[in-house]
């Protein structure tokens, strides 16, 4: 009898359920179960961030990056969730970090020497496993990096001072080419042409059409920025990316014509040692079978676009800051007079220009251009107590870190922020470690040579009190002015060398 009562078959289960649980309760239990499932998933990560929410969270976070731009989205998420947080890009877990201790750990270790980005996007712009900037294959990247390091140091760095200064002088003598009818100077175009001319003189040495290639470089950069984290489905709809594909092709075709001429000259050169430069070294490596032709072409392209792409914008922001801060301009001019006088700048002067160096550092801290770094974890790790799995994407929000830690007046532009030595873990405009910027030393040389040459000849002024704070900017892969807006030009007033401190 007892066994019969315990036997579930003895009962009609369908008649029992309605008595024990009303039909309306079933949806509630299902929703509760789903909630517990989601809660259990989210509980597997101790890192702050938005909820997974049945896959909706990753879609929203990736969508925010596409809508706001990478830089703006990073700042948003760090403000909301803290300085070490987690989102998703293309369904992959991605950390956004603005803590100096975490950045220091990541930059110094080899297992963070890879970047991340859409494979299809990088293939479209020619950077997938080629070149150096976004080459995500560590072994291939290690093959190309030494060519860049050699070209950007030693004799090349020494020559850069004279080459850069002479190029700017030549372009200033033709200032009317970038001056409109009102007498306003298109500073960005001027600086981009100087940067391209300087890079070509040192690394390729083939005559080129500066104005045409500068325009093509901007088109290439727009494509790079637009395609870097696009979802794969974007590339299945040809009309969506067709214009970017064309922009990339326009620049690559132009550069390949120059490289073809370089190859021809190398083949007819009797004394090869007299034509050795960055491009020649790469072409000879190709002949030895060390590099593919496609990789050689991409390396040369990246060397030519690097300075016009970022350094020109950095110098543009610096000139706007000088225009707003006459006391800083006066201090820089005094130092130029003391260290250099009326002669041309030389390599020995570079280290002596301390006021200018602090100005450059403070400009890059206060108004950065490249303010984030994208990396990928190549093995499991623990960072500041948080577990990081192999394959995790990481974005280092350097620009935000520069306004959060160490500096006495982080939200002001003032040289007081560099009055004392700043430990390098708190200031990383170029990064450091295995994947630090290969051109960080030559970049400082170029910026000092440009500023000395320009400021000793002209006093600069913005239009209608325009300043870096009021310029409308696009904050995506980098932070740069929105060039569709007006009043980005400047007024250049010739400076009387005998009265250069009157302004």
From Swiss-Prot:
Major subcellular location class: endoplasmic reticulum
Pfam families, A to Z: p450
UniProt tissue specificity: Widely expressed, including in adult and fetal brain, placenta, skin fibroblasts, adipose tissue and gonads.
Modifications the protein undergoes after translation, according to the UniProt entry: Phosphorylated in vitro by PKA and PKG/PRKG1. These phosphorylations inhibit the catalytic activity as measured by estrone synthesis from androstenedione (36% decrease for PKA and 30% for PKG/PRKG1).
Cofactor(s) named in the record: heme
UniProt-recorded Gene Ontology molecular function terms: aromatase activity; electron transfer activity; estrogen 2-hydroxylase activity; heme binding; iron ion binding; oxidoreductase activity, acting on paired donors, with incorporation or reduction of molecular oxygen, reduced flavin or flavoprotein as one donor, and incorporation of one atom of oxygen; oxygen binding; steroid hydroxylase activity
Catalysis performed (reactions): testosterone + 3 reduced [NADPH--hemoprotein reductase] + 3 O2 = 17beta-estradiol + formate + 3 oxidized [NADPH--hemoprotein reductase] + 4 H2O + 4 H(+); androst-4-ene-3,17-dione + 3 reduced [NADPH--hemoprotein reductase] + 3 O2 = estrone + formate + 3 oxidized [NADPH--hemoprotein reductase] + 4 H2O + 4 H(+); androst-4-ene-3,17-dione + reduced [NADPH--hemoprotein reductase] + O2 = 19-hydroxyandrost-4-ene-3,17-dione + oxidized [NADPH--hemoprotein reductase] + H2O + H(+); 19-hydroxyandrost-4-ene-3,17-dione + reduced [NADPH--hemoprotein reductase] + O2 = 19-oxo-androst-4-ene-3,17-dione + oxidized [NADPH--hemoprotein reductase] + 2 H2O + H(+)
Protein name as it appears in the record: Aromatase
Originating species: Homo sapiens
Source organism phylogeny: Eukaryota, Metazoa, Chordata, Craniata, Vertebrata
